[in-house]
């Protein structure tokens, strides 16, 4: 993994419990807490964010999401896709996480994720392609996180890791190959 000075600084700040906001490098890794990185441009319409996500442990708890600004906590993140501690991938829908279909994950496997975001409607859909497999739709027209119903623009990619039910940080995930483009019909 190629680490850039900004990524190293972000990891150090996160370890100290301080939020980080900066540009997206080639590869970013979550840690305990929130890290945020600038999208290439602030988004105000319908758009897609695609990226490769790799969980570094089984049954971890971490998400990748999109927010308006550097988040202070998870309530500030509008759209999220998560590797949960039950070993499946789920998506935030308003006030809770769920998925339209169950998709398990394994440590150190790459999952191509695509979030199709409709900012005007405050809805998004999520598609995931496990390495070597076709893309599947996990979420169709899910609502933004309840606290983000009034957001007008999105400009940050957010990575986060959390402690599991036993109070232990169970692992991080990596994100690479981030791309942003105008939304196409799924």
Residue spans for each PLM region:
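Short, aromatic/His-centered strand-loop micro-motif at the edge of beta-sheets
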Residues: 91-112
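Secretory/extracellular carbohydrate-interaction modules
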Residues: 22-89, 182
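Short tryptophan-centered beta-strand motifs in secreted/extracellular beta-sheet-rich domains
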Residues: 109-117, 124-126
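Bacterial N-terminal signal peptides
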Residues: 8-15
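Extracellular carbohydrate recognition
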Residues: 165-177
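Sec/Tat signal peptide C-region and signal peptidase I cleavage site
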Residues: 17-21
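Bacterial N-terminal signal peptides that target proteins for export
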Residues: 1-8
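Short, solvent-exposed beta-strand-to-loop segments that form ligand-recognition rims
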Residues: 129-154
